[in-house]
């Protein structure tokens, strides 16, 4: 599901979608997304990423703050990480992040989405409903039983996203 283009064609607007945090650190699913992001940032030293995710009712910190801290603690330059800390779902992740990207002067017509493999299809679909041309950088899900569980959950979430796009 990695559909990145040549380095000079990679979208300027890059968003890492949040996932649940555990205490003051990322969950396994989120850690895999962040590790994928770190590799991308090493390969594309001119790119800035937006980490997107608010604070769930059972979370002590915003997903964005946990993601930013993880990236910086693992070698990312803080000046290359922008936090979007209000989103509570995938649509808001993309919408709120695009507003931050636009304010920072990035072209938001194309977006590189970093998320889990099971989540990529729906994330790209939602980006298209927001008039963005999406590209994906997917992290793997392991163990396989988690992938099965999350993929089944995504079927229903995708149906909901499709319905919302059609009916507001």
Which role fits each region the language model picked out?
Residues 147-167:
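A transmembrane-helix-recognition feature enriched in membrane-embedded lipid enzymes
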Residues 2-151:
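A structural signal for short, hydrophobic/glycine-enriched beta-strand patches
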């Amino acid at each position: 599901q990695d559909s990145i283009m040549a380095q000079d064609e990679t979208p300027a607007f890059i968003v890492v979608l949040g996932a649940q945090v555990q205490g003051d650190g990322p969950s396994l699913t989120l850690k895999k997304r962040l590790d994928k992001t770190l590799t991308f940032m090493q390969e594309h030293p001119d790119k800035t990423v937006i980490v997107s995710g608010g604070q769930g009712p059972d979370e002590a910190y915003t997903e964005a703050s946990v993601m930013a801290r993880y990236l910086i603690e693992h070698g990312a330059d803080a000046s290359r990480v922008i936090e979007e800390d209000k989103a509570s779902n995938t649509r808001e992740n993309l919408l709120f992040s695009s507003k931050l990207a636009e304010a920072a002067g990035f072209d938001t017509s194309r977006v590189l989405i970093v998320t889990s493999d099971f989540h990529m299809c729906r994330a790209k679909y939602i980006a298209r409903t927001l008039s963005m041309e999406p590209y994906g950088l997917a992290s793997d899900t392991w163990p396989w039983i988690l992938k099965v569980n999350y993929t089944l959950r995504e079927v229903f979430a995708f149906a909901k996203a499709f319905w919302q796009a059609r009916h507001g």
